[in-house]
């Protein structure tokens, strides 16, 4: 499940309620959005952190990847509209950055596993002994 705009709560003021318990019951995973860090492997599968790629360059995304690798964490990247940097919007995942990113993660010497969220979550659930 992808939380709309990363929001895990509904309502306002005193009536605000988390719908994470509903997501936990109905879905194998729930992904937030625009978080600043990657996921520890001892995590809440109903609230997976997702780091935003919008308006980022390859150098900053690569730094996030390397940090997650060094820490033994799972990095989920997310973005919105994909296009060229000439498009002026706050929610643009730059296609040139994506091309660099894809070249980097496809290179076998970098040893980066990419897969759908559900596949990686299943692997962690089976193999994480914590």
Locate predicted features.
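Catalytic domains of cell-wall/extracellular-matrix polysaccharide-remodeling enzymes
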Residues: 1-62, 97
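C-terminal domain-boundary segment and adjacent tail
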Residues: 27-43, 62-69, 76-130
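Hydrophobic beta-strand segments of well-ordered beta-sheets in folded domains
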Residues: 1, 73-75
